[in-house]
Amino acid sequence: MPAGATLPVLDHELADDELQWMKSVYADFSKARAAAGLEFNPKEALRAILARAEYRLSASPDLTGPGPWRLGQNRHGRGVAAVFLPKVELHTHIASRTDQFPMYVMGEAEGFSIDEDGKPLLTPVVDGGHFHNAPGAPHAFLPKVGVPKPDNWEIAFIAITPRNLKEDTHRVSDEVRALYKQVVRQDAPLGV
């Protein structure tokens, strides 16, 4: 049994102020992108926005380096991190709900998940969107299926989580890997 199976399940709804915080961060990010034109550096713009006083958290994330920027915490005690993935990470959090808010994609992306009927699902990633992953739900962001992947492919998102996910991140089952291959048409990455 995976270690995360012994953790208490944390499945919450985000509070209105958490959702509003995300909407405001994304709105300011969109304004910065529109104003910068071709000179736009999305990671630096996001770093500058998250450093603003109006977006300060109870515990501010470490915004140094290339990311991920972790260790932020909001007034509800939930973790806030900015994550930058240049590759697919298919995994699950057995005991933790996660909320992911895509900020930008270099290229195009889809979110892999499994619906209530156990069928694999690919959902287009839209900047400013919201992906909710219930405890135990396998998930991954990946380059859009059938579209050539640019060399600089990357997805950036802000995650709001109930705990440090290092203690609750697990590989998916062989069955999930087979479902991934069914819709993506390539082998699933080995995972975490």
Tell where the protein language model's regions lie, with residue ranges.
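A short, N-terminal "cap"/entry segment at the start of jelly-roll beta-barrel domains
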Residues: 1-80, 186-192
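Conserved short histidine dyad/triad with adjacent acidic residue
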Residues: 80-97
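Histidine-centered metal-chelating micro-motifs
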Residues: 88-91, 110, 129-148, 165-166
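Short glycine/proline-enriched turns and hinge-like loops at secondary-structure junctions
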Residues: 94-96, 116, 145
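Structured binding elements
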Residues: 102
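Short acidic-glycine-tyrosine-enriched beta hairpin
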Residues: 115-136
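Double-stranded beta-helix
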Residues: 140-192
